[in-house]
């Protein structure tokens, strides 16, 4: 493990630099500016020797008169290259962050559906926002400080060697001890930084859930619970941050102590070996000045280590995400529009954990007909609907579309044939028109309005002040449940796909909303192959075929009347729902 850490760090650096490579001209300019900045600082230290020797020991009036001009030019040039270097390095950093965020977001969008089942939105947002931002500190802030300070250290050591190499060598004896201290804190900070990455994901997740579910939080009195949970997460984050701070403090204090010992050794050597080592007063003071100047860059370099380790931990988190395999798309067949005949042949499906949730499922949906899946929660209905657009990949068996296995169709072509209307409608914080036209961005306003009318959405949209240009808020929060459903149906109508998946599209709606939704669904189902998932059996009476699922297996199939005649599982479900409906009417 100890031997792998430097190798792992080098690999991370190498991979990170591949994202910096496109911006190398600006990076090179920034590096040169920072080198020049450090060179000017080291030059000023050497000027101390010349100033003292030529002003007080061997007086050189010509040189003394030039000192103000030299200082003015040096400071002006130092300011220019400092600003140039800072601008260039920041430009590179923000460019890298922009590119990385775009790549990470694009990668997340194309990950398999089962990854979303396991990951939380808070963790994903933390990677896009926090982890990528840590990379910026490595690619700009840390790199700038590293170049400036390492060049200054080299420059000052060079000045010391030029002035008196004997004393300088004594100071260099302290360098291995600095390396030992830095190596110790390096490992500790990296380990803690991984915990910081994780806790930031947890903090984001808790906050995101509480904000999105604020109605549930308030109605069930969960405010104090959420605040306590958030406080615990932030306290854990604070403790990890403090561990990093302690490591940095040990690092800085240890390095400063080593440098102080080095300075003391040189002063003692200069005093006791004055007969052997002969230097001028200016040279001696210049060496002392150089050593004192070394404290700041050495301190910065040691604290910089913690920043670099945090950045590398962030980079590692980002790269681990980017290394996850994308949704597999080996299909090569492209179809403009299918008839819509679907067949499930001996279909099995198991989750990654090995739990089989579908067992030998076989059925056919004729083109242009409707099939409803019913059964208790967890019976496999939604899994079947998820297999059709290949959100999940089959464990065994074949699903065909117009006789072609869906694995042979390209994902884009396959999903182009389908529309989805689900219980949990997804609307974007945009206008109603853009939400209806989602995926059909080239649609005209007339086409959007026509879809709205067919979905019985135009009547409430036309009453809004901005009509179809009304923004709906985050996830359509400004609309009622029934209104959101009608927008989703309008979106499906506009897409005009030959296959329609209705996943609990009318559940949890009031009677008036359900009336509108049913009327809208009749419009969108015309001439389309429709797969319906429903709990309310009253909504699927007219389906051409009803399939009853239980524990991942098909137990019955037939029309509504046929299944009632069998007096099996479906009939039992229907009687229970009818009895509940009668009770509701009596109570009302």
Where are the regions that the model predicts?
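Hydrophobic alpha-helical transmembrane segments of ABC transporter permease domains
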Residues: 32, 40-44, 81, 129-173, ...
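Short intracellular "coupling" helices and adjacent cytoplasmic loop segments at the cytosolic face
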Residues: 2-6, 58, 94, 102-126, ...
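An intracellular "coupling" helix at the cytosolic face of ABC transporter transmembrane type-1 domains
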Residues: 25, 113-114, 130-139, 143, ...
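ABC-type nucleotide-binding domain
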Residues: 330, 337-588
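Transmembrane helices of ABC transporter permease
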Residues: 22, 26-36, 69-74, 144-194, ...
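Alpha-helical transmembrane segments of multi-pass membrane proteins
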Residues: 74-93, 140, 144-151, 172-196, ...
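Helix-loop-helix
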Residues: 57-63, 159-173, 247-316, 321-322
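Membrane-integrated ABC transporters
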Residues: 1-40, 56-70, 85-89, 93, ...
């Amino acid at each position: 493990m100890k031997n792998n850490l430097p190798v792992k760090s080098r690999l991370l650096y190498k991979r990170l630099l591949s994202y910096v490579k496109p911006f190398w001209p600006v990076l090179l300019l920034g590096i040169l500016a920072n080198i020049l900045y450090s060179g000017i600082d080291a030059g000023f230290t050497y000027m101390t020797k010349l100033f003292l020797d030529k002003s007080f020991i061997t007086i050189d009036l010509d040189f003394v008169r030039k000192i103000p001009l030299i200082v003015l030019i040096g400071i002006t040039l130092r300011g220019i290259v400092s600003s140039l270097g800072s601008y260039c390095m920041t430009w590179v950093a923000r460019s890298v962050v922009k590119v990385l965020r775009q790549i990470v977001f694009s990668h997340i969008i194309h990950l398999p559906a089962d990854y979303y089942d396991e990951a939380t939105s808070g963790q994903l947002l933390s990677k896009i926002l926090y982890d990528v931002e840590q990379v910026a500190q490595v690619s700009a802030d840390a790199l700038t400080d590293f170049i400036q300070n390492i060049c200054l250290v080299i420059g000052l050591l060079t000045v010391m060697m030029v002035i008196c190499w004997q004393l300088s060598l004594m100071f260099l004896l302290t360098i291995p001890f600095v390396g030992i201290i830095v190596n110790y804190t390096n490992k500790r900070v990296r380990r803690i930084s991984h915990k910081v990455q994780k806790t930031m994901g947890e903090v984001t997740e808790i906050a995101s859930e509480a904000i999105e579910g604020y109605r549930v939080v308030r109605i069930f009195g969960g405010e104090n619970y959420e605040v306590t949970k958030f406080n615990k997460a932030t306290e854990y984050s604070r403790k990890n941050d403090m561990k990093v701070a302690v490591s940095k403090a040990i690092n800085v204090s240890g390095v400063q102590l080593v440098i102080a010992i080095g300075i003391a050794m040189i002063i003692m050597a200069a005093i006791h070996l004055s007969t052997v080592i002969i230097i001028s007063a200016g040279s001696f003071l210049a060496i002392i000045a150089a050593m004192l100047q070394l404290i700041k860059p050495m301190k910065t370099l040691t604290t910089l280590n913690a920043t670099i380790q945090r950045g590398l931990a962030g980079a590692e988190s980002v790269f681990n995400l980017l290394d996850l395999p994308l949704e597999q798309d080996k299909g090569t067949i492209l179809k403009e529009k299918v008839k819509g005949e679907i067949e499930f042949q001996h279909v099995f499906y198991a989750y990654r954990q090995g739990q089989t949730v579908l067992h030998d499922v076989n059925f056919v949906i004729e083109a242009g007909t409707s099939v409803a899946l019913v059964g208790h929660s967890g019976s496999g209905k939604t899994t079947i609907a998820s297999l059709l657009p290949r959100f999940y990949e089959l464990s065994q068996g074949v699903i065909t579309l117009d006789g072609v296995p869906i694995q042979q169709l390209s994902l884009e072509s396959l999903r182009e044939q389908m529309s989805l209307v689900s219980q949990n409608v997804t609307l974007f914080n945009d206008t109603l028109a853009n939400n209806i036209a989602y995926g059909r961005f080239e649609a005209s306003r007339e086409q959007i309005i026509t879809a709205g009318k067919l979905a019985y959405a135009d009547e409430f949209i036309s009453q809004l002040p901005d009509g179809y240009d009304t923004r709906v808020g985050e996830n359509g929060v400004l609309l009622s449940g029934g209104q959101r459903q009608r927008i989703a149906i309008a979106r499906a109508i506009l897409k005009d796909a030959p296959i329609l998946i209705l996943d609990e599209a009318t559940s949890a709606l009031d009677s008036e909303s359900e009336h509108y939704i049913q009327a809208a669904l009749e419009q969108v189902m015309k001439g389309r192959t429709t797969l319906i998932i429903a709990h309310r059996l009253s909504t699927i009476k007219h389906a051409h075929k009803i399939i009853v699922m239980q524990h991942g297996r098909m137990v019955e199939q037939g029309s509504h009347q046929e299944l009632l005649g069998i007096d099996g599982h479906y009939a039992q479900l229907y009687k229970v729902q009818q009895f509940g409906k009668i009770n509701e009417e009596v109570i009302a």
